[in-house]
Amino acid sequence: MKSLMKLLGLAVVLSVTACSQQQEEKKEAKTNLAGVVESKVISSAIAYQQAGGKAEFMDGEVIKITDQNYAHAETAKNYRNWMAKGANEGISHLRILAPRGKKAPTVQMNHDCLYSVAITKVVAGKISFEIPQDVLVYTSVQVIDQYGHGQQYIVTKGKHTVDFDISDGTTHAFLIWRSGLEKGMNVAKANQDKLTTWGLVSGDFKVPNYDFEAVDAKTAELRSEVTGKAFYYTFPRNEKEVTDRHQWNLECALGWGGASPIANEANLYTNSKMYSGEKSYSTTFMNPESVYFSSITVYNAQRYLFEDEEVKNVNSNTWLVNSDNTVTISFNCGPDAKNNIDTKGQDYTFTVRYYGVTEQVIRANNKDAVPNRLNPMFMMTEVTQ
């Protein structure tokens, strides 16, 4: 009988303890979700900003910029820019081609897709989002932490709940949906309309109070370092994978928001050195045959799209392929040249993007690669007219 009473007593204690733990967990969850609002669709990021959209900042003194915190600060700047377009309230659709020049909210945007962005709170080390089953074009979701790392890149349709490394103190994720332009603007916009707010936890992000003028100055300084040589991105997936802080700072300055290369799924990016817009060049390389598509886009020295609307990009959905399965891209070689990009006499750097990059291309395009025909940077030559 005594044993039975002891067991009953123990059961009561365990039950009370379990209830207390559940109440604490509920209280903690409620505290963690303080300030959260119901996620909504911002139909036009531009209209939202024009109506007075702005970012909300943390209290406290202005934070000085150091080599150690630069990536966090540059990331905060991008969160800030997209908050002004509604991304803290749900999913915000940029219904136009990426803006040219410094009007762009993010460096090195491209004209391969339309962008939709959301800032979402990390809950219990996870975030959730959806790629609907009935999307009309290439659709991906990239998940970026507060240090600029693309922790996840998803192309699979469906509802996703993914692990998110918060060991560096990250509390929110920056989600980028890309809707491909392979079927034109109208279809890409219709694809944006299919995207949902499923899984988003919106409304409570505040921007760290960095000295953003100093951030911009540091960014310009870093970009100036690499104008004379090709640049290859590594995009480590979290802070623990950063082995060279300066390299990572360069990557954030030149191409914040890029994805970590995963063969046959995510993307690879490479930047050329600066070239004179008064000369003619071409590069002929093996067809990269990316799973989705590849593209080449030109930028100015600050890595923004040229203001001139007539400066276009070239994309594998439309480029001409040579009979030997090579691709020739021409720069300022005249309208009759194959796949010609005219920079209107302006000096430029070009970026190659491989969406769904192959393992072979990854091996051929990195800082340790020897000259090879899968690397457009190595094949660039001046053309005598």
Predicted regions and their residues:
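Sec-dependent signal peptide recognition
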Residues: 2-10
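Generic N-terminal leader/processing signal
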Residues: 4, 24-28
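A compositional/structural signature for long, glycine/proline-rich flexible linkers
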Residues: 27-385
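C-terminal motif of bacterial Sec signal peptides marking the signal peptidase cleavage site
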Residues: 15-18
